[in-house]
Amino acid sequence: MHRSLKIFGTLTSIGMVIVLMQGALVTKTESGEGCGATWPLCFGEVIPTNPAIETIIEYSHRIVSGLLGAMVIILAIWAWRKLSHIRETKVMAILAVLFIIFQGLLGAGAVVFGQSHAILALHFGISAISLATVVLLTTLAFEDGKPNPPALIVKKGYKGYILAVFAYCYAVIYTGAYVKHTQATLACGDFPLCNGQWIPMLSGPVGAHFFHRVAGTLLLILLVVALIWTLRKYSHYRSLVWTHILCVILVLTQYATGISIVLTGNELFVAMMHALIVSILFTTLCYIVMILSRNKAV
């Protein structure tokens, strides 16, 4: 059922991952001004002549983002028509279109007008939401027609806790993006200490970096608690158990790559993996929230 939609959704999801990674590469290599202050053209040209590597990185990101923007809109319309009988479809379709447009506008605005570090950090957060909505739309296509799609009965306290962790994860994503855009990635040059101190001066780049460390550590603890709670009370829900196990694996890997960024001097591959893993973690949490919303908590 919906074979073509599944294939297209899968391709769009993969494409969104590529866009997200390209965006991380633009930030890491400081290629955001690779096309000057012109958009959508590059230095006023459709095809820039004798482009520098920063120009290639930035302009290829624009081209792929534009293509994926069109694909997301097509996916949203397609899913709306074929999966409108599923409760989450219309909400996800609307969110997918809104956030991909918002993401594009933020990117264009950053080039033409320049933006504060706070707004630039938001761009990555919006990218994570865009990826999640596309993946969830694709997931709905795969779930449709199955006899027992995940519908869970859980306590209100558990559901509230998961929602809080979900929101907190997004906040941690934002703090990480803020660290990148404020050039605070290596403000603490060692680990677990920060420049030889357990608690450094909490101001400027060092303060931003240290705050992100603490926030990431707390996220790890919260997700481990969520997994233990799930195993103790809801082990009969396989979808809930395995997604929480995946979350803990992802957050542990994310934590390890964060440490590696410091110890390797912000090596490119490690930094890219750090951005990718947290986006997959957020998408997984979005799926958990979606299946928890299908039944009222008791």
From Swiss-Prot:
Residues 1-6, 84-92, 139-158, 231-244, 293-298 are cytoplasmic. It is a multi-pass membrane protein. The chain crosses the membrane at residues 7-27, 63-83, 93-113, 118-138, 159-179, 210-230, 245-265, 272-292. Interacts with CtaB. The N-half (TM1-TM4) and C-half (TM5-TM8) domains are connected by an intracellular loop. Each domain is formed from four-helix bundles and they align in a pseudo twofold symmetry manner. The N-half domain is the substrate-heme O binding domain and the C-half domain is the cofactor heme B binding domain. HAMAP family: HemeA_synth_type1 (MF_01664). This is Heme A synthase. It comes from Halalkalibacterium halodurans (strain ATCC BAA-125 / DSM 18197 / FERM 7344 / JCM 9153 / C-125).
